[in-house]
Amino acid sequence: MKAILLAGGQGRRLRSITGKLPKPLVPLVGVPVLDRLLDLLRRSGFTDVCATLCYRPETIQEHCGDGSSYGVHLRYRIETEPRGTAGAVRACSDFYGQDDFLVISGDAACSFDLLRLYRQHQSSGAAVTVALYPDAEPLQYGLVLQDRQGYVRHFIEKPDWPHVVTDLVNTGIYIISPRAMTYVPEDTPFDFANDLFPLLLAANEPILGVPMDGYWCDIGTPRAYYRCCLDVLDGRLSPVPPEAPESPDAPAPCTDPLRRSVPCRDRAHRMRTLSEAMMEAGADFTNGLHVHDGSWELTVRPDAEVSALQVEANTPDAAAETARLLELMEQHGK
């Protein structure tokens, strides 16, 4: 089965965490989001994969190669300018041809049963099937209103609280029949939720919504990223995929997720952190370091064999705190 993986994101809101990494390579407790997604695709039977790239495409190409180390066949489409989600997929028409295919975002952690989603789509005759997920804070997502048969009647994009009538959000994971893509113009920025789906509804093309079990989290903000990292440590997402290639930019994995002191056998040269049990390859704090600033407490202790990082955070709102933490660490290194 075929899948298109949208991996062109830059991750501006995560810049204090990602640096120059494309957002799909952001690590979740030592494993890039993209590695986890490719492992999920393989386990779900989607072994023919096309990734759409835009920001620093060579970084992802070097990291993933031809996909053989993940058990998939991986090819790429590179955008010189962003085309929107639907526009990027339309540019892959030679890849999907006349086959139904999966679309999945490269910057969300997920454990859905994608094969079940695919089978429900094929049995329904829908033009598009949308994976839905309940979210207690749905304001930043698109809400989906369905009829009793599960077909979509309305999309409400990023509502305010008075307009929240459901907690089911659009995850950006779709099964699409090729006829739906004929509504997308070529070489024109075009989005699924804002552009294509209203056209399909106006044309009476059926869109099926399927509430999914499992785990899903869009890591687009520091707060969501922090929450997702803790969810991984709590076992809500599957463990590190086996045989995933190691990235030189990825953080050293924690062998004991219950520990807040994370050892790394090679002394780091630069270091960034957001939450407990995470350390990115980085700085050499040879003499040790202790920082206590507001809700953050950080300790880097000197050791003959290892360097360690300990972080305690009393709040999940990490944007300003991460920047402050990095500033303190840089001052110490001067």
Please provide the spans of the model-predicted regions.
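Structural beta-sheet core signal
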Residues: 5, 51, 103, 128-131, ...
